[in-house]
Amino acid sequence: MQSILQLSDAHLSPRNTLFRGNVELIRRAVSDRAPDLVLATGDLSLDGADREADLQLAAEWHRGFPGRLLALPGNHDIGSDVRLMPTQPVDDARLARWQRHLGPGRGVIDLPGWRVIGLNSEVMATGHAEETVQADFIRESLAGLGDRRIALFLHRPAYLFTPDEAYGPWAIGPEGRNALAPILQHPALRLVASGHIHLHHEMRRGQVAHVWAPALSFYCDPSDQAGLPGGRRPGALLHRLHEDHVETILLAPEGMEAVRINDIQDQTYPRS
């Protein structure tokens, strides 16, 4: 059976040693049986959007896992839509910096019976040229699908609860959702896996599992995520690809440290 290891929101930086212990514990947990694919769903770095050294270190640590790596950027890696990151919008320099260390930020990989599609959620609704390029890529990603099932990965969830919900900071906005429609509405879709929220949660819509990966780093104060379901325990996910569905297993080895962002604010994202 094919398997995909999903790593998300490690927020690594050479300016501190935060979260490295959690990443190392997951690496050890999978060292005896390498996954067929390692999918990093964004925010690999603490501030790669402005600091190349953060991206460089994050790339090194994520490449330390056994298996092929497909890395997708998060808002702290390349910036995002100005509504989410008003001082760090996606631009050519930020995209180029990511690509130097971690590749194109999207990809299609075929595994037996499955097509894995990874997308850059942070260019959606930005107006950047890369948004148009990716829209074409989305359509092309379905060519030659045959009887394969689809597993979609990206940093931000396609939506939190319903496909018609309004814009909010925790998911892709309606404009981006429109670009995703060819995949989200495809009858072969079985998994939409994301990060960003620092919560572990799974819901089903028909045959599709929508899974939020836990963060490898910190959790948010519950008061800042009112109404959002899920567990705050750090970890990673192992997706096992069956013939017509995905079995998702939480990896949370003993010793992983759960840290509230408020308690390390000065070492991560100091408030101005």
Segments predicted by a language model, with ranges:
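N-terminal active-site segment of His-dependent metallophosphoesterases
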Residues: 1-57, 61
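A short C-terminal boundary segment appended to hydrolase-like catalytic domains
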Residues: 191, 235-272
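A cross-domain feature marking catalytic cores of carbohydrate-active enzymes
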Residues: 42-44, 73-75, 121, 154-156, ...
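Extended active-site neighborhood of metal-dependent phosphoesterases/phosphodiesterases
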Residues: 50-145, 149, 174-185, 206, ...
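His/acidic metal-ligating clusters that form di-metal
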Residues: 28-38, 115-117, 127-211, 246, ...
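A short, polar/proline- and glycine-enriched secondary-structure boundary/capping micro-motif
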Residues: 17, 128-130, 222, 256-265
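Generic enzyme active-site microenvironment
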Residues: 7, 41, 72, 153, ...
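Active-site environment of divalent metal-dependent phosphoester hydrolases
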Residues: 13-16, 46-50, 75-83, 124-127, ...
